[in-house]
Amino acid sequence: MKKQEIVNIANELMGNPSKKQEYRLLNSLVGHHSIKRLTEEQFDTVYTFCEDVSKIREQMFKDLVTENDSEVDAIESIYNVSQSIKDMIEEAAFGELKKNTADILNRWWKKVWRVECRGNVAWNNCGTVQIGLKEFAKARLEFVGINAKNMFFGNEYKLAFRVERDTSFANEIRDLLMKFPILLPCNCEIREKESTTIAIYNVHTAKPLAAMTSKQMTKFLNELYTKKLNYCCYQLVERFKDYK
């Protein structure tokens, strides 16, 4: 989208501050303001608009001496709104996953789990959702190569078991899993030596994770963590106790 078009949209938004600007911008772009109702095409429209705003803002700061102050204010205003929409998208995509993951695993392991998004997961870029034991810094589970778009529209995900910055420990755990393959769930592959990614579990869902209701999400994750990964994780957690 061209700079003047974005400035015009920004001026229109600022002209009516009584309504939630994020909703008004979404209505302007896709005809409604529900993140959960975005089609894939509408998601791309919002993403492209926000990327255009970021690029124009960046260029305006480079050319600040020659820019019109009112245009700078307009772009800065709509940039802030677009970043708020980004936060809304991230929460809609990952909020239930993070909450349910923490709730389920904390019931099993006495409230010691943390769940965090890493990277620019709100858009099309690849990030991670890290799932770790608070007292063990060296090992964790991660949803890898994940972003809001495949949370809303995909049905294939990868859950990795990783060891951070400790290749010897990684190899020890890898050797344990190769020696006792019963510890691994189905659809799980062990990665090569010298890598801190130990294993990748391929997760397939009947519908996109972010499209699930809270009840559906709870049921799916409960099965994923407690039935398919529970035995493997429990055995590994016992091993982790020597590596605080």
Predicted features along the sequence, with ranges:
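Interfaces that engage single-stranded nucleic acids at replication/repair/recombination sites
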Residues: 1-63, 210, 219, 223, ...
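Polyanion-binding interface signature
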Residues: 68-207
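Intrinsic-disorder/low-complexity, polar/charged segments
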Residues: 18, 34-39, 68-77, 83-87, ...
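Short amphipathic alpha-helical segments
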Residues: 42, 93, 97-101, 165, ...
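Short, flexible helical or helix-coil boundary motifs
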Residues: 13-17, 33, 50-68, 79, ...
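C-terminal amphipathic "assembly/sorting" segment characterized by alternating charged
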Residues: 187-244
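Low-complexity, intrinsically disordered/propeptide-like segments
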Residues: 16, 29, 41, 63, ...
